[in-house]
């Protein structure tokens, strides 16, 4: 098959004749599978080649779950203050402004209320692109308002977690949100209103240690990293190699921390089945 071999080496195509490949035309999964971005979007950002679930944000989850993407946003304009006047390599206020500019979000969580296959639901979804999906006072307050809305309308609550944990720039105020969100979710339990927690890649730190693991059903996407401290920190602390697949959703399911794993393409149908089953009991 020498048809495509050049007889002369070193022949260069003039720059003006080269065809440019547009940025973002292809996606390469961690396993090396190549897929067109258009096909990836049509497949709700799941690689059809290997099933890899690409990280997405609240915009994409809301488009996937709410019927015709119709929903009412709750507490849309809440933003973090800076009572500690925190500064690391830049002031916290500047970091917030930069994150808001880059993501077009107010903070690392959005809350919406609308129909999911005709059934009303409150959905709170975290965005990892906003300061690592970190949990600060706004996250705690928005989850509290999501619970209040679910109680008022007797609607089930879904929280989609994707976070690096508590936001260090808010220090103790951030850690307080662990107790605040846990206490609010207890109100849902007492009212017998379902709370489903979906853990996605990654869910770690104080988020895992609070609302992410308190669902009536704790479910996860395939291959998600879920834990408190990261695997590198644990390995360095105990001085041992960790089991294969440690802290993946499959590992947690095998050890009883999750109820089941759901493919993102089946998420909406699975939620509907789950809530129908609960409504009939």
Curated annotation (Swiss-Prot):
- One GO term (biological process): malonyl-CoA biosynthetic process
Q: What class of enzyme is it?
A: transferase
Q: Which GO terms describe its cellular component?
A: acetyl-CoA carboxylase complex
Compartment annotation: Cytoplasm
Swiss-Prot/TrEMBL keywords? ATP-binding, Cytoplasm, Fatty acid biosynthesis, Fatty acid metabolism, Lipid biosynthesis, Lipid metabolism, Nucleotide-binding, Transferase
Tell me, what's a Pfam family for it? Carboxyl_trans
Q: Where is the CoA carboxyltransferase N-terminal domain?
A: 24-281
Enzyme Commission number(s) of this protein? 2.1.3.15
Q: Does the keyword Transport apply?
A: no
Catalysed reaction(s) here are: N(6)-carboxybiotinyl-L-lysyl-[protein] + acetyl-CoA = N(6)-biotinyl-L-lysyl-[protein] + malonyl-CoA
What is the first-listed, main subcellular location in coarse terms? cytoplasm
Gene3D superfamilies according to UniProt = 2-enoyl-CoA Hydratase, Chain A, domain 1
The Swiss-Prot or TrEMBL record annotates one GO molecular function as: carboxyl- or carbamoyltransferase activity
The biological pathway it contributes to is: Lipid metabolism; malonyl-CoA biosynthesis; malonyl-CoA from acetyl-CoA: step 1/1
Q: Which PANTHER family match?
A: ACETYL-COENZYME A CARBOXYLASE CARBOXYL TRANSFERASE SUBUNIT BETA, CHLOROPLASTIC (PTHR42995:SF5)
Main function: Component of the acetyl coenzyme A carboxylase (ACC) complex. Biotin carboxylase (BC) catalyzes the carboxylation of biotin on its carrier protein (BCCP) and then the CO(2) group is transferred by the transcarboxylase to acetyl-CoA to form malonyl-CoA.
Q: How does it assemble?
A: Acetyl-CoA carboxylase is a heterohexamer composed of biotin carboxyl carrier protein (AccB), biotin carboxylase (AccC) and two subunits each of ACCase subunit alpha (AccA) and ACCase subunit beta (AccD).
Q: Which family does it belong to?
A: Belongs to the AccD/PCCB family.
Q: What is this protein called?
A: Acetyl-coenzyme A carboxylase carboxyl transferase subunit beta
The record lists the lineage as: Bacteria, Pseudomonadati, Bacteroidota, Cytophagia, Cytophagales
